[in-house]
């Protein structure tokens, strides 16, 4: 019965948990470890959708047989500058280099998602254009030291207070940049959870 259907978010990201909670659909979370290396043969859009699917599949394989009818949501976000995905920084210097490159210009943020249920997959992605104004080396250093954006694609969190002074434009879904395109995900989940819609 649809009222007993379980939604599982294939992520421990606090940002994705907060965003999915906005839909009003009850859910659980499951941690997942997969190789998130981009396939150079695929486009950035294809990569975020494929990694999202791999995350959802990994969770689906790990759940018990009585939970096999669960709906599993996987998601992946990347920052793309001049056609090149930036991913998450490995250390301070990498984060500094990324932010130095992003400041003073616009870039794309892509978030892919995959919903698995009853052997079927719904995959999609959202694109948002973000413009970050000029930042001095001192401002970049302070941001990294205070916010520690090492778990964030592109080395920044758009919701971070210290970045607010530098975001000069957003074209597209703000929540997509945070980590989940809430309206697109809700539209895809709504038919599976009609009692919650």
From Swiss-Prot:
The active site is at 76 (proton acceptor). GO terms for cellular component: cytoplasm. GO terms for biological process: nucleotide metabolic process. HAMAP family: Maf (MF_00528). SUPFAM superfamilies: ITPase-like. Its cofactor is a divalent metal cation. InterPro entries: ITPase-like_fam (IPR029001), Maf-like (IPR003697). One of its GO terms (molecular function) is UTP diphosphatase activity. PANTHER family: BIFUNCTIONAL DTTP/UTP PYROPHOSPHATASE/METHYLTRANSFERASE PROTEIN-RELATED, BIFUNCTIONAL DTTP_UTP PYROPHOSPHATASE_METHYLTRANSFERASE PROTEIN-RELATED. It catalyses: dTTP + H2O = dTMP + diphosphate + H(+); UTP + H2O = UMP + diphosphate + H(+). It comes from Chlorobaculum tepidum (strain ATCC 49652 / DSM 12025 / NBRC 103806 / TLS). Its main location: cytoplasm. Its EC number is 3.6.1.9. This is dTTP/UTP pyrophosphatase. It holds the Pfam family Maf. Nucleoside triphosphate pyrophosphatase that hydrolyzes dTTP and UTP. May have a dual role in cell division arrest and in preventing the incorporation of modified nucleotides into cellular nucleic acids. Belongs to the Maf family. YhdE subfamily. It is found in: Cytoplasm. The record marks 15, 77, 159 as: Important for substrate specificity.
């Amino acid at each position: 019965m649809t009222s007993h259907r379980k939604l599982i978010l294939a992520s421990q990201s606090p940002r994705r948990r907060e965003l999915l909670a906005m839909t009003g659909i009850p859910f659980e979370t499951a941690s997942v470890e997969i190789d998130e290396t981009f396939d150079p043969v695929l486009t950035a859009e294809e990569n975020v959708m494929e990694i999202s699917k791999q995350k959802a599949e990994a969770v689906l394989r790990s759940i018990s047989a009585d939970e096999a009818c669960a709906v599993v949501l996987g998601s992946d976000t990347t920052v793309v500058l001049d056609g090149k995905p930036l991913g998450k920084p490995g250390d301070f210097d990498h984060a500094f280099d990324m932010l130095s490159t992003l400041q003073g210009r616009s870039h794309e943020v892509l978030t892919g998602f995959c919903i698995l249920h009853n052997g079927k997959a719904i995959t999609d992605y959202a694109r948002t254009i973000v413009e970050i104004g000029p930042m001095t080396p001192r401002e970049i250093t302070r941001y990294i030291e205070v916010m520690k954006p090492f778990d964030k694609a592109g080395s920044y969190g758009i919701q971070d207070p210290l970045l607010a002074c530098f975001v000069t434009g957003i074209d597209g879904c703000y929540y997509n940049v945070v980590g989940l395109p809430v309206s697109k995900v809700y539209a895809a989940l709504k038919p599976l959870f009609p009692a919650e819609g």
